[in-house]
Structures are given as C-alpha cells and as structure tokens.
Amino acid sequence: MENIAKILRLAEEKILLVQNLKDLQEYKVEFLGKNGIVTGELKKLGSLNEQARKEFGLKINKLKDKIQNTIKVKEEILEEQELNLKLAADKIDLTIPARKYKQGSIHPITQCSEELIQVFSKFGFTINNGPNIEDTFHNFTALNFEDDHPARQMHDTFYLKGQEDSKPMLLRTHTSTVQIRAMKNGNPPFRFIALGRTYRSDSDMTHTPMFHQIEGLVIDKNINMGHLKYVITEFIRSFFENSHIELRFRPSFFPFTEPSAEVDIRMNKNDQWLEVLGCGMVHPNVLKNVGIDSSEYQGFAFGLGVERFAMLKYNIKDLRQFFEGDMRWLKHYNFGGFDIPNLAGGLTK
C-alpha cells in the first residue's frame, strides 16, 4: 500500500511539472509502459496467494487508472497551450498592406459588343451565328453582288487556297452571310442580329484585316423605310446614351439593299458629321434568292463595325490598338466583369 501511494504521488508530481507533450509522453512510458513502474508492480502478483493477489490487483488497476486520468488532463492542458502559442505566432497583422490583387478585365470590344446586344434586345432582336469560312454564293451571289463586282477580287477578299477551280471558299467579308443562311432555313418573319468576325484585305488606322461586325435584319409584312429610320435612330441614341444626337440618312448604294443609305451622326451642332453605319431596304433579288416572296414580305437591313462604335464611345483614336495586346492600354479602360450591361441596369459604367 505504501509503495502504491508513493508511486501515485511521484507520478502526479512529475506530470504536474511537465511543460511539453514530448516530456509527458516520456513519463507515460516511464510509469505505464511495457517496462514501466506500474507494470513492474503487476509482476509481483505471481508471488501472492489468491486473496492477496485479488486485493493487490485491484489496487494496481486503480493506480493505473488514476495515472492515466492525470496524464489525460495534463495532455489536454498542454495541447491547448500549444494551440494558443501557434495561433499567436500565426496571427495576421491587419495593419500590414495587402498584396496587390491582379484581376483580369473585359476587353473594350467585348464590352462594346455586349452593350450593342443589350440595346438591340430592347427592340426584340435575337442573335444568330454562322461560319467564318463561306462560299461565294452566301457571301456574294445571294446578296446580289454582280460577278464582276470589285469586292469579289483577290485584293479585297481572302480566298482559301486549293478551292479556286471547284467551289471557291473564303473568309466572310460581312456577317450578311448569316442572314442568307437564316432566311434559307427558316420562314418569315425575321428579326435578328448577327455578330462576329469578318475579314477584308485592308490595314490602316481605321481598317484591320479582321474586325467585328453586327448586321441586323427585319423581314415582315408591310415593313417600310420609316421602320428602319425609327430603329436606327433609337438604337444610336440608346447606345450613346444621348437623346440629342443628330442623325442624317444619306442616299448610298449597296448591292443587297434598295434604297440604301449611309447614317451620319454628330453629338453636338458644332461637331463634324461622322459616318457610323450603312442600311437600307432589303433588295427584292435577295429575297428571291432565299425563296421569299417580295410582294408579300419586305424588310430592312443594317450593318455596323463594333470597333468603330467602341472608338466613338470610348474615345479611341487608332483601330489597331484593339489588337496589339498592350496591357497598359487595356488597363486604362479596365472594364470589370460587373460592367457588362444588363436590361435592368442600363449601359452606364
């Protein structure tokens, strides 16, 4: 009994003074391990008679339980202490300046495209798409281009090699090709825009070999030039968010429209007129080429360059800057993901 009490007292003293989990584990082995002090006491059971063995075994088990409980309590205390020390060491100093967060931005062409789509959607226009590689029928013939029209020549259009003698293929020069495919494969009425890349052999401050274009088409019964002028006028004023913009429609010529017009705008009375888009009533030959009766259905079409509208709205001087990938230039505009317009929020950044 005295030896058991002495062992318990010694164990409690050592465990009480221990300062870390490593030393606590060593004391656990010292008292409860295979060759520990308590295990040594258990070995004495073999030399005792049955009654003494029973009494001594009960006392040894109680000793073992008390030491285990003492170790467990101390272990919890030390673990909490170590956790607090770690948290204190890892504490974030909120006064330290944060790391600069690099975030991408929306390209001005994408931003402008989304704004254009948003405006046209208010007039009930949907979006149609088509292939970038086209044949001459969809790109020229169906749109009433004569066989000797200059636009068909190599110096204006990118033709694909190896197709000259069979079915000439080319990079589309306008998204009007989407209109032809949609009218061939569907039935009127139509009201949609076609947005996408177009390609022409030209490069200077106001032209690039590849550019983005939106072309719109409306086909229905009793459509006239008044409808066209209304849509274009409201579209221009909505996009530039200026109800006082002046517009003028100048007579022009396009193979696929008759009559045709160029649209000029000026923001203020003292500004110069700026040409922004072409439009007109769909030519009867175009309707005939896609199987639509021009005596029953009429329509209007218009086309505009996305880059051109972006340059006017965001005051960009050189068209080529859109494609140079200059991060400083892109950062200057810094359109964020939340700047993409929606019908509820409007266009203003």
Curated annotation (Swiss-Prot):
Organism, as annotated: Rickettsia canadensis (strain McKiel)
Gene Ontology CC annotations of this record: cytoplasm
InterPro entries per the UniProt record, alphabetical: aa-tRNA-synth_II (IPR006195), aa-tRNA-synth_II/BPL/LPL (IPR045864), Phe-tRNA-synth_IIc_asu (IPR004529), Phe-tRNA_ligase_II_N (IPR004188), Phe_tRNA_ligase_alpha1_bac (IPR022911), Phenylalanyl-tRNA_Synthase (IPR002319), tRNA-bd_arm (IPR010978)
Binding site for Mg(2+): E258
Gene Ontology BP terms: phenylalanyl-tRNA aminoacylation
The keyword Disulfide bond is assigned to this record: no
Cofactor section: Mg(2+)
Residues in coiled coil: none
Gene name, Swiss-Prot/TrEMBL: pheS
Cofactor note: Binds 2 magnesium ions per tetramer.
Subcellular location: Cytoplasm
Segments traversing the membrane: none
Name of protein: Phenylalanine--tRNA ligase alpha subunit
Keyword hit for DNA repair: no
Pfam family, one: tRNA-synt_2d
GO molecular function: ATP binding; magnesium ion binding; phenylalanine-tRNA ligase activity; tRNA binding
